[in-house]
C-alpha cells in the first residue's frame, strides 16, 4: 500500500468593507416573541403578582388566603373582569388577608422601589386600615406600609415600597387590620424601574437585551398562541388594548400542551397587549410585524375553522 500525504492548500480572501456591493434589507434580521414558558406574564411583562384580578377558573390560584376571604362578583369594578375578593375581619381572628406567591416567587432586590396598587372599597362607614407587606422566603415581613380605605365606591390606592432585602421567592401580603370589611380587585406590584420607567411597563433588563440585538423587525405576539386551543381561546387583539384593568383574561395555548405537562396557572392577562407591542417596536427601532388570527384554531387540539364568509 502506498499512502500519499497531501498538504491542505491555504487560500486568502480579502474583504474590502469600505466598498459595499449590495444593500442588505434590515428587515432580513429580527426577533420573534411568543408567550411560552411564562415569556409575557411572569417574564417580559414586569407585573409581579399572579392572577391579580382573580379571573383564573380557580379564582384564588396564586393566592394564599387567611381569615375570612371570599370571591365576589356583585357590583364589580370592571365589567370584563368582574371577580374581586372580600376580606372580613370579624374581630375574633388574629388577622385576615392574603398572600400572593408571584410567578414561582416574587423577585425583589434590596433598595429597589416597587409600586403597589389596588382598587378598593368598604361597606363600613368608618375608615378601614390595610397593611401591605413584603415577606421574604423565611416568612418574615420586613416591610409594612399602612393604607386607609374609606367609601363604598371603588377607588385606586397606590404606594411605593422600598425592598429591604433581596430574595427571589418573596411574597406580597395584604392584611385588613381594622374590624370590618374591604373589597379588593386588581392587586398589582411593579418595579418602578421598568423599561423607560413606564407604569404597566416591561422588565428593563430583558428589553435592554432585545435592544442590544439591534433587530430590524419585531414579530409578535406569537404563532400557535394566536390560534388558541379553540376558537374561543384564540388571541383577539382587540381584547389586548384599552384600560389594562379591563382587558379580559384569556387562556394560554401552552398551558396544557401535553397531558403530563399541565400548567393550570398559565393564562394571558393581556397587560402586555398590542399597544405595548407596537410601543416596544418603536423603542427597539424595529419594524412591527403583528400576527393576527385567520379564524383557524390549533389543528392539533381541534379542527375549528371560521367560515370564509364570516371572516372580517
Please name every model-derived segment.
Residues 1-10:
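Bacterial Sec-dependent N-terminal signal peptides
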Residues 9-269, 282-291, 302-311:
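Extracellular and organelle-lumenal recognition/adhesion modules and their flexible linkers in secreted
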Residues 278:
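Alpha-helical bundle segments that constitute or directly flank the non-heme di-iron/ferroxidase center
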Residues 272:
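Residue-level signal for the nucleotide or nucleotide-sugar donor/cofactor binding architecture
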Residues 295-298:
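Conserved radical SAM core fold
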Amino acid at each position: 500500500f502506498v499512502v500519499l500525504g497531501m498538504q491542505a492548500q491555504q487560500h486568502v480572501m480579502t474583504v474590502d468593507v469600505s466598498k459595499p456591493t449590495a444593500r442588505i434589507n434590515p428587515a432580513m434580521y429580527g426577533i420573534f416573541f411568543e408567550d411560552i414558558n411564562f415569556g409575557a406574564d411572569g417574564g417580559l411583562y414586569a407585573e409581579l403578582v399572579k392572577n391579580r384580578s382573580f379571573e383564573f377558573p380557580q379564582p384564588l390560584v396564586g393566592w394564599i388566603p387567611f381569615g375570612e376571604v371570599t370571591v365576589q362578583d356583585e357590583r364589580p369594578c370592571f365589567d370584563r373582569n368582574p371577580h374581586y375578593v372580600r376580606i372580613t375581619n370579624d374581630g375574633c381572628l388574629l388577622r385576615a388577608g392574603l398572600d400572593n406567591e408571584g410567578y414561582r416567587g416574587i423577585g425583589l432586590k434590596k433598595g429597589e422601589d416597587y409600586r403597589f396598587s389596588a382598587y378598593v372599597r368598604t361597606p363600613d362607614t368608618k375608615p378601614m386600615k390595610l397593611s401591605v407587606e413584603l415577606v421574604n422566603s423565611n416568612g418574615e415581613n420586613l416591610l409594612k406600609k399602612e393604607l386607609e380605605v374609606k367609601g363604598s365606591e371603588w377607588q385606586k390606592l397606590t404606594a411605593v415600597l422600598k425592598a429591604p432585602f433581596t430574595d427571589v421567592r418573596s411574597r406580597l401580603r395584604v392584611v385588613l387590620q381594622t374590624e370590618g370589611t374591604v373589597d379588593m380587585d386588581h392587586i398589582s406590584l411593579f418595579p418602578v424601574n421598568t423599561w423607560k420607567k413606564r407604569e404597566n411597563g416591561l422588565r428593563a433588563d430583558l428589553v435592554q437585551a432585545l435592544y442590544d440585538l439591534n433587530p430590524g423587525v419585531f414579530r409578535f405576539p406569537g404563532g400557535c398562541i394566536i390560534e388558541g386551543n379553540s376558537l374561543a381561546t384564540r388571541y383577539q387583539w382587540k381584547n389586548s388594548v384599552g384600560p389594562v384593568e379591563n382587558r379580559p383574561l384569556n387562556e394560554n395555548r401552552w398551558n396544557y400542551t401535553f397531558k403530563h405537562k399541565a400548567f393550570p396557572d398559565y393564562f394571558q392577562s393581556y397587560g402586555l397587549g398590542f399597544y405595548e407591542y407596537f410601543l416596544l417596536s418603536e423603542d427597539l427601532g424595529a419594524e412591527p410585524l403583528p400576527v393576527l388570527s385567520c379564524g383557524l384554531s390549533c389543528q392539533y387540539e381541534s379542527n375549528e375553522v371560521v367560515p370564509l364568509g364570516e371572516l372580517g
